[in-house]
From Swiss-Prot:
Species the sequence originates in: Alteromonas mediterranea (strain DSM 17117 / CIP 110805 / LMG 28347 / Deep ecotype)
Region (LT domain) location: 273-463
Gene field: mltF
Chief location category: membrane
Protein name in the entry: Membrane-bound lytic murein transglycosylase F
Keywords: Cell outer membrane, Cell wall biogenesis/degradation, Lyase, Membrane, Signal
Cleavable signal peptide: 1-33
GO biological process per UniProt: cell wall macromolecule catabolic process; cell wall organization; peptidoglycan catabolic process
Classification of source organism: Bacteria, Pseudomonadati, Pseudomonadota, Gammaproteobacteria, Alteromonadales
Length: 463
């Protein structure tokens, strides 16, 4: 992620914004909400724990919302004081009472919440999905559900369902058969897990959270979409002036224009939008069974790499089948060619230890060939693409990226050009010619999904 480079260019812009605001203000010396938090030198933000919002990972605080918030604090030149809450209502009351400056939970804006709070600009749009366990009877209509829908109290989903049930009761001659039950004992991710386990029949989740959890629980299925294209935005106190909102508009405009928002969105969601039920079930089963045979070897030869990333690559290559062979003759756990095996002293490509050792060292050499100015995780994704199609074709894609006005050092830009390598009007201009770049793109995105799943399974003690 190249957030630091972008942030350095953004930090001074707030000074210009404030200067304009001060000069245009007709009443001097009246503090605004923005000037108050700048004087305090901190911004107080309420949030909730979650894979897409905020959590403490192995490398410190992480999460899509967290990185956006940290960027905004850096943009203002203040400290981010982040307060995770276990209750939406308590958190929202703290915002109303002026004890928080912003609430950022990765939730959609509902009409009920909009009457209660002001909001910054919409930065994403999501669908609200009615979720049930795959294999159960798919409900045809919300009014005919035979079990309650469970939602987190105070969440966007609870507000949405409350409004839907009220409308159904007014429109239907007969009473709605099911009911909404809200809880503060479980968060939205736990409710999805409970649906997957069969402990509850239904919940509602936004498309972002569902996409993150379906890799972990492939038997989560969508019964129907309850609401499409709902905006996501950060909540602000309703009665305060618009100074913080104006700063948010400037901030999001700048990070969109700079490309940093696109990079961040790709980091958390770019590889999980597509879901394959069969593949996810097969992978999770293999991770909890077959992987145990080779885990120690991946750990032994990973070197500076995360062993789980190396294992994810191997699954994409061979499904952890040491005897695997492709139609082009590559073989083994890491699917090495004869030439690559020779270069890295692999005598028997079907020998698990030799294959993992050779594959890891070959991949490390590709990483070292990626220009040093390219930061992580872009370096890794580009090296991974070159493992699949070769460094020459990767460079062709990077050149096409630059020619088309993209950034050749950003994976999110380069991956859009990889499929062009099999289109004649593009590959005829490249040095290395035709390549199945679309397959290289899918190769990398699959590994990213497998890696995320392995990290989670490892944290759960399942591998």
């Amino acid at each position: 992620m190249q957030s630091q480079d972008y942030k350095k260019r953004l930090k001074l812009q707030i000074i210009i914004i404030l200067s304009i605001a001060v000069m245009s203000c007709g009443v001097p010396n009246v503090p605004t909400a923005l000037s108050s938090l700048l004087e305090r030198e901190s911004i107080r933000v309420g949030t909730v724990y979650g894979a897409g919002t905020f959590y403490n990972g192995a490398e410190g605080p992480q999460g899509f919302e967290y990185e956006l918030l940290a960027g905004f604090a850096d943009y203002l030149g203040v400290t981010l004081d982040l307060y995770p809450f276990y209750s939406y209502e308590v958190m929202l009351e703290q915002l109303e009472e002026g004890n928080l400056d912003i609430v950022a939970t990765g939730d959609a804006v509902t009409p009920a919440l909009k009457r209660r709070f002001a909001y910054g600009p919409a930065y994403q749009r999501v669908e609200q999905e009615l979720v049930f366990q795959a294999g159960a009877t798919r409900p045809r209509d919300l009014a005919e559900l035979d079990s309650p829908i469970i939602a987190v109290a105070g969440s966007s989903q609870a507000h949405l369902l409350s409004n839907l049930f009220k409308r159904l009761s007014e429109e239907e001659d007969e009473a709605v058969q099911t009911q909404l039950i809200t809880t503060e004992d479980s968060d939205s991710e736990e409710l999805l897990q409970q649906v997957a386990n069969g402990d509850i029949a239904y919940t509602v989740a936004d498309s972002n959270r569902l996409a993150l959890q379906r890799r972990r629980y492939p038997n989560l299925a969508v019964a129907r979409t309850l609401n499409e294209n709902m905006p996501m935005a950060w909540a602000l106190p309703l009665q305060q002036d618009d100074s913080v909102k104006a700063a948010l508009i400037e901030y999001f405009g700048t990070v969109h224009q700079s490309g940093w928002f696109t990079v961040l969105e790709d980091k958390y969601f770019g590889h999980i939008r597509q879901f394959d039920y069969v593949d996810s079930r097969a992978f999770n089963y293999a991770a909890e069974s077959t992987l145990t045979q080779y885990k120690s070897l991946f750990q032994k030869y990973a070197g500076d790499l995360d062993w789980r990333l190396l294992a994810a690559m191997s699954y994409q290559e061979s499904h952890w089948n040491s005897d695997a062979i492709s139609r082009t003759g590559v073989r083994g756990l890491m699917m090495l060619t004869l030439a690559t095996a020779s270069d890295w002293n692999v005598d028997d490509r079907t020998d698990p230890e030799q294959s993992i050792r050779g594959g890891s060292r070959y991949f490390a050499s590709l990483l070292n060939r990626i220009p040093a100015r390219i930061s992580e995780p872009d370096r890794t994704w580009m090296a991974m693409a070159s493992y699949n199609i070769g460094m020459g074709h990767l460079e062709d894609a990077r050149i096409l990226t630059e020619q088309q006005g993209g950034n050749p050092d950003l994976w999110v830009d380069v991956k859009r050009r990889l499929p062009q390598l099999r289109q004649k009007k593009y590959y005829r201009t490249t040095r290395y010619g035709y390549a199945r770049g679309d397959e290289a793109l899918q190769y990398v995105e699959n590994i990213r999904r497998y890696y995320d799943s392995l990290v989670w399974l490892d944290e759960q003690g399942k591998i």
